[in-house]
Every structure is written in C-alpha cells, then in structure tokens.
Amino acid sequence: MLDVCLLGTAGMMPLPNRWLTALSLKYNGSNILIDCGEGTQIAMKEAGINFKPIDILCITHFHADHISGLPGLLLTMGNAERTEPLTIIGPKGLTRVVTALRTIAPELPFEIKCIELNEQDEYFEMNGYHIHAFRVKHAVLCYGYSVEIKRSGRFSVERAKEKEIPMRLWNPLQKGNTVEFEGRVYTPDMVLGPARKGIKVTYCTDSRPLEHIVEAAEGSDLFICEGMYAEKEKIVKAKQYKHMTFYEAAEMAKRAGVKELWLTHFSPSLVRADDYMPQVRDIFANAYLGKDGKSVELMFDED
C-alpha cells in the first residue's frame, strides 16, 4: 500500500485555501516528499503526517514556490531529534542551493546527502522506492518524478521443494535476497513466479507538454500534473511561461494510459476551477481537481 497526500496545490504564491506545492508519499514506514513550498509544514500537520520519517526529498526545480519551505522543515526535523540522514535529490546546483538555504538552519543533528541530477533520465532505488527523475521543459532546469513500488512474483512452495531448498532460506528468498548456504547459491528466481504489477505515481509540474512526460507516466495508477491555467485563451501565457493548461494535462494523461489524473499547481488568478472540469473530462474521464490535503491509499491489485 502506498499512501499519497497532495499537501499544496498553489503555484507562484500561497492563498488562504492553497499552500504552495508539495506531495507526500508513504510506504512501509518511510516518507518521500516531492517539493517543499511555503506552508508545507502546516499542510503536513493538517494531514497528520509526521516530519521525522521523511527519508527522501525530491526537488523539481529551484523556483521559490517549490523550495521556500525547506529551511523551516529542516529545523523542525532537527528539533524532533532526528538523527537519520536525509537524502535530497534535485537538479544540478542542488548542493549550492541547499547550502544557501541552510544559512538559517546551520546546525542540524542529521546528515544531508545531496544527489544532483545531470542526465535526461536518472534512476534510484531507496527504501523500497524505485524513483525515475525525468527532465521536463520549463524556464529553468526542471524534473518530474515517477515513484514505483515494485512487486515480486508469488512464492512457489512446490518449486522450493522441487529444488530441495532448505526451509530456513524461504523467507529471505521470498524477500528478493540471494543467499549462499553450504557452498551453494540460491536466487529468488528459483522460487518466485513472474513479477506482479506494482504501484506507480508520477508527478510533473512546471512544464510544457512533452512526449518524454507521457513516456515517464505510462501506466501510472495516479498522474499528478500541473494545470496552471483553466481558461482556454490562456494557452498563450502557458506557452510563454512554460506551463500547461488543464486540457494539455488531460491529453497527456489519456496518451499515457494512466488510471487517474489529479490537476495541481494552479495560477493565483484561477477561480471556480470546478466549472472547467466537464470539458477536461471530455478529454480524460478520470480527471479530478487536486485540493490541499487530498489523499488516497493505492493498493496492489488482487491476484
């Protein structure tokens, strides 16, 4: 099970009912935070999300509405007596930016490990998360993120017995570990069937539509994508400032074959957003407006 909570849906500036951009993902006691705009701490408190288990922070880019909440969050994590290292992933220049922001949070009881993205696509495996960082098209260097929880094949007692694998090795093999025992090497594929479908969430904000985004989001259970503008005539502004309209996000969701779309990162000028959703659903039926605190528990498929 993967817990997803959209903490902030505002772009550019916070509003009374919209904190700036942030997304929380929780799996097996570990949290990923994607972006950390102003108000993220309050949004986490409102959603009942603990600060301490955040192990990984993914930053899309260095515009203030996506990173201005970081110094305060680091201080709060330090005050919670956290000692475990925090990994921060972000575009080239991340170390310099984090160092500058830490001017007001200089002494922390935990280590910060910065991973700078340099390639078009980069992949990481941490704490059971498979993270794909993919470059998008904004006014500055910017990345989207797909986070996947993979699922191994079903354990076969029959195969284990056929291969005379000692019962004491079944559990580590079932967990995907290779084991050496009494001079013989045992691998998970000896006892596991084909890999089963996992859970995938893709998050993209601050970009023009790209085939690269469609490819990264393909097959996602949930696609969280910016819809900066809802008014169709604002396509001109979207192109000028490298953002998307509701309808462009819906087109990408349709082409990527995702199960569900949440729109987010709204312009401060956007009001009565619900009025535009019928037109959006004409393009992609399973589209919804993101709201601060909107959450879902994504489950593995029954099989």
Predicted segments, located by residue:
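Metal-dependent catalytic neighborhoods of phosphoester/phosphodiester hydrolases
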Residues: 69-77, 98-101, 271-279
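Conserved beta-strand hairpin/beta-sheet module of binuclear metal-dependent hydrolase folds
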Residues: 1-47, 85, 145-147, 193-204, ...
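A gly/proline- and charged-residue-enriched helix-loop-helix capping module
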Residues: 96-103, 114-119
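Active-site neighborhood of phospho(di)ester-bond hydrolases with catalytic His/Asp-centered motifs
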Residues: 34-37, 54-62, 90-91, 202-207, ...
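General small-molecule cofactor/ligand-binding pocket signal
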Residues: 5, 89, 113-118, 132-134, ...
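Active-site metal-binding motif and surrounding structural segment of the metallo-beta-lactamase
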Residues: 38-89, 113-118
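Short, surface-exposed connector motifs at secondary-structure boundaries
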Residues: 26-28, 53-54, 80-85, 255-262
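Metal-dependent phosphodiesterase/nuclease catalytic metal-binding core
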Residues: 118-263, 272-283, 299-303
